[in-house]
């Protein structure tokens, strides 16, 4: 389990699974307090690399399940040679592009600002289409099984 939030609870320790808590705010500027950094990205990559091969499911969450976790999930999908379309084309998610970009870059995936902008446009179009079809605004938590 990867948790990207400033809100932690002692109850999390009751869960006897491998977990990484990354203490970050949901901000998309490196200038803001609590922003995701390359050090955070290295922590996540190290955590993923150290998982035993028998681990087949990965739960990624944040406070509300739509931004930091989806940015992380999209990057991890690319890292595992999968498409990240399921994240960017989902109108219920607004992936945190700082989390996504820094994770990709730290892993060695060529992720230019233009490539990130293209994905943000795809996500924005998905939301506008859902709104037009009166299918936006529903809340859905993110869970990715890898």
Segments the model singles out, each with a brief description of its role:
Residues 49-57, 76-146:
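PTP/DSP superfamily signal
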Residues 20-59, 92-93:
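Helix-loop module immediately N-terminal to the HCX5R catalytic loop
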